[in-house]
């Protein structure tokens, strides 16, 4: 199955007092990579979560977003500096006595004092939460892969359409190439007749045409193009992560088309080569999206 490298998948899971959601977005990338964004208390869990995603992906950059609605991410603990609080209380009583104040110290005011009362948060490992996140990640990556496969089918269909167009252009080029030398001979003959009244040296004309025929022969390029078309179809049919192979073939297609354009020395073939390069460029754009 051909896959695109772009896609999206998401999933949410709830169990008891735990609620998690996972989102995955993938874009084109030469290799495979996961950029994770998790709540800070879950950073220890990042590598395991990445591996869960990567085992389903061959190429592409994945953006992973995890959100958790739970009080179980951290363990909160209240700490009171009793010796320091004793000093504050003693100071409050001294102030009351010194200034003959009637009000008693408000206990809640002591909670506002720096360093007296502090809340410490400690990261905790929760197996139930981890399992829930993995479950959501598995469902999200399944949705991501399904979308990538649907887009992959469209990419493959579009590529094959352009391959069909290229094959037709190559057939037309092959037909024109068979008459390139005769057309050149006619042009050369007419040009010489225009320039001179002398009798033509037929052997010289034949020699010039032979040199031109050798220089403009595109038989090998056409044969290789046909071979590349067949390989392209076979690779698409094989499925899997074939993006790199197809990218290499596209480069070869472009190289052969350029060679034909430089060798043919015929305006009709040149027009066909321009159309070939346009189709090849469209294939290249699609192949860059294939995993």
From Swiss-Prot:
Q: How is the cofactor bound?
A: Mn(2+) gives highest endonuclease activity in vitro, followed by Mg(2+) and to a lesser extent by Co(2+).
When this gene is knocked out, what is seen? No visible phenotype, no effect on sporulation. A quintuple ribonuclease deletion mutant (pnp, rph, rnr, yhaM, yloC) is viable.
Q: Which EC class is this protein assigned?
A: hydrolase
For the biological process aspect of GO, one term held by this record is: RNA catabolic process
User: Molecular function (GO) terms listed?
Assistant: RNA endonuclease activity, producing 5'-phosphomonoesters
Residue ranges crossing the lipid bilayer per the database entry? none
Q: What does this protein do?
A: Endonucleolytically cleaves ssRNA generating a 3'-OH and (presumably) a 5'-phosphate group. Cleaves preferentially at U residues, has no activity on dsRNA or dsDNA. Upon expression in E.coli contributes to the degradation of small RNA (sRNA) RhyB.
**What does the similarity note say?**
Belongs to the YicC/YloC family.
Can you name this protein?
Answer: Endoribonuclease YloC
Organism expressing this protein natively:
Bacillus subtilis (strain 168)
Taxonomic classification, please?
A: Bacteria, Bacillati, Bacillota, Bacilli, Bacillales
């Amino acid at each position: 199955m051909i896959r695109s490298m772009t896609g999206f998948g998401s999933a949410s899971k709830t169990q008891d007092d735990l609620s998690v959601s996972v989102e995955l977005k993938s874009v084109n990338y030469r290799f495979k990579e996961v950029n994770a964004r998790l709540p800070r208390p879950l950073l220890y869990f990042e590598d395991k979560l990445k591996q869960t995603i990567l085992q389903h992906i061959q190429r592409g950059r994945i953006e992973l977003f995890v959100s958790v609605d739970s009080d179980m991410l951290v363990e909160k603990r209240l700490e009171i500096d009793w010796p320091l609080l004793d000093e504050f209380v003693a100071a409050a009583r001294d102030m009351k006595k010194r200034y003959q104040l009637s009000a008693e110290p408000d206990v809640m005011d002591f909670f506002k004092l720096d360093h007296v009362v502090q809340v410490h948060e400690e990261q905790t490992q929760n197996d139930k939460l981890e399992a829930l996140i993995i479950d959501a990640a598995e469902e999200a990556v399944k949705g991501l892969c399904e979308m990538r496969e649907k887009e992959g089918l469209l990419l493959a269909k579009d590529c094959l359409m352009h391959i069909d167009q290229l094959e037709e252009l190559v057939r037309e080029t092959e037909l024109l190439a068979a008459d390139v030398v005769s057309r050149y001979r006619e042009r050369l003959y007419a040009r010489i007749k225009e320039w001179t009244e002398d009798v033509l040296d037929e052997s010289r004309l034949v020699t010039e045409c032979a040199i031109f025929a050798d220089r403009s022969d595109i038989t090998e390029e056409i044969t290789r193009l046909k071979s590349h078309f067949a390989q392209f179809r076979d690779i698409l049919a094989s499925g899997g992560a074939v993006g790199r192979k197809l990218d290499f073939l596209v480069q070869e297609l472009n190289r052969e088309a350029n060679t034909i354009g430089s060798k043919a020395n015929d305006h009709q073939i040149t027009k066909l080569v321009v159309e070939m390069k346009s189709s090849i460029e469209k294939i290249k754009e699609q192949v860059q999206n294939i995993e």
